Amino acid sequence: GWNDATFSGDYRYFLNCWSDANHPYVYTIMDRKGKVVREVLNNDKLTQDLAQFEPTKKEFFTFTTSEGVSLNGWMIKPANFDPTKKYPVIMHQYSGPGSQQVTDSWSIGSMGNGGLFDYYLTQKGYIIVSVDGRGTGGRGAEFEKCTYLNIGDLESKDQVEAAIWLGKQDY
């Protein structure tokens, strides 16, 4: 999951926003020891409303490139996924320095981030995939800074490697 905290001026309380890739935001007020004081918003109604569309779960994966680099990704498969059938794949990635697309957090809006349009495409039989290549954030300074003064080279290679890896899957 993903947490984002906003603290009170005296640090006695904080507003915590929690989500994961398959659950919308839950806002709670907590004390400094992490005890829930009050739930502000749980988004149960949104969860129920979205259930009618039968969204499939975002799945996370890791693979290793031919250069020995471990890359993280996520994919959303069609609802009636058959692992013996081949599916068209749509890959989306920004890969700008320090960016991160592969997070275990809620994303309902934009295309390519696991938003509603991506789920619509899965209903039409597509697999949607995002892979964080070298230069993206969340993996430490060495991983993020390896593209310094060489933007576009390693990031592109990593996306090609991801496509090759996906092409080798049974589906």
Regions found by a protein language model. Give the residues of each.
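Serine-hydrolase catalytic core recognition
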Residues: 2-171
